[in-house]
Amino acid sequence: MDEPRETAGAQSLRRALQLLRLLAEHHEEGIKLTEVIAASGLERSTVHRLLSCLAEEQFAERDPDGKAYRLGIDAMQMGFASMRRVPLVDS
């Protein structure tokens, strides 16, 4: 079977989604920039740029002390919206 091809021009989106998944995994305690860099394997400048954009769009937020990131309000609202639509158990 052929491997699925990546959608052309979607590298930044895939990277941002990777970061959102990391933020979700560490939402309660937050995750430091250095930990995001290590876990993602991305360059520091790339991670910083993507997290800054996600924060501007309220999909990520920084702790008041600025040391950790977690999901932002818009990411959580999307999760809540999906919970209302999709049944938790299939019939």
Question: What are the language-model segments listed below?
Answer:
Residues 2-85, 89-90:
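N-terminal helix-turn-helix
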